[in-house]
Amino acid sequence: MNIEQFRAKSVDDLKAHLIELRKEQFSMRMQLAMGQFQKTHEIRRVRRNIARVKYVLSWINRASA
């Protein structure tokens, strides 16, 4: 997803998506540690999406303050 798609979502949707991404990241890290994970580029994608969601949430908080 790109930043514009995240900005179009509500705060509750963003928070739910952030939790979902963190669960996915945790699962990937565990699979990587066990040697079962092959698509290491997906870890980078998830990490960057987490950063995008957190940025949009802080952007919304600053705009409303």
UniProtKB/Swiss-Prot annotation:
GO biological process, one term: translation
Listed SUPFAM superfamilies: Ribosomal protein L29 (L29p)
GO CC terms: cytosolic large ribosomal subunit
Pfam families from the UniProt entry: Ribosomal_L29
Keywords tagged on the record: Ribonucleoprotein, Ribosomal protein
Molecular functions per Gene Ontology: structural constituent of ribosome
InterPro entries: Ribosomal_protein_uL29, Ribosomal_uL29, Ribosomal_uL29_CS, Ribosomal_uL29_sf
CDD domains, per the entry: Ribosomal_L29_HIP
Family: Belongs to the universal ribosomal protein uL29 family.
NCBIfam families: L29
Name by which UniProt lists this protein: Large ribosomal subunit protein uL29
